Amino acid sequence: MKLQLVAVGTKMPDWVQTGFSEYLRRFPKDMPFELVEIPAGKRGKNADIKRILEKEGEMMLAAAGKNRIVTLDIPGKPWDTPQLARELERWKQDGRDVSLLVGGPEGLSPACKAAAEQSWSLSTLTLPHPLVRVLVAESLYRAWSITTNHPYHRE
């Protein structure tokens, strides 16, 4: 199974690249984790936000292909670390690759939400999207460590 983070935005601060890359390199060869960056639509005074969301959503769904789609969204289910580890095990048993979708400033398109088999809420707080990348990578790595009895996670 391959994990894929599909996120809107392409120019992240160095600390995001460093943090995300650190967890990326830790993932085992049998569970590769990749980042697919979707260019954010141009926003401005007269921007058609609905159209921008649609376009970003189309690109996200195209990147996900036939993968299981999990959206990251405030109204999603709040999984604690052991629950995320159980979800990771279910995903592995399912046999499909998994795409986790992170929207842009206005969130996810209705099409992305409709295509999702699951929706995961990291927090009821509004989080900066660059930080979400690092949080997701660390959370998935920690969940993997639980499923393999790796010493990274401690109770």
From Swiss-Prot:
Catalyzed chemical reaction(s): pseudouridine(1915) in 23S rRNA + S-adenosyl-L-methionine = N(3)-methylpseudouridine(1915) in 23S rRNA + S-adenosyl-L-homocysteine + H(+)
Molecular-function GO terms, alphabetical: rRNA (pseudouridine-N3-)-methyltransferase activity
Annotated Pfam families: SPOUT_MTase
Subcellular location: Cytoplasm
Keyword S-adenosyl-L-methionine found: yes
Top-level class of the enzyme under EC nomenclature: transferase
Sorted UniProt keywords: Cytoplasm, Methyltransferase, rRNA processing, S-adenosyl-L-methionine, Transferase
EC number(s) reported in the record: 2.1.1.177
Entry GO terms, CC: cytoplasm
Annotated SUPFAM superfamilies: alpha/beta knot
Gene3D superfamilies cross-referenced by the UniProt entry: 3.40.1280.10
Family matches, as InterPro entries: Alpha/beta_knot_MTases, RlmH-like, tRNA_m1G_MTases_N
PANTHER family given in the database record: METHYLTRANSFERASE, RIBOSOMAL RNA LARGE SUBUNIT METHYLTRANSFERASE H
HAMAP family: 23SrRNA_methyltr_H
Job description of the protein: Specifically methylates the pseudouridine at position 1915 (m3Psi1915) in 23S rRNA.
Summary of subunit composition and partner proteins: Homodimer.
Family the entry assigns: Belongs to the RNA methyltransferase RlmH family.
Name of the featured protein: Ribosomal RNA large subunit methyltransferase H
Organism per entry: Klebsiella pneumoniae subsp. pneumoniae (strain ATCC 700721 / MGH 78578)
Gene: rlmH
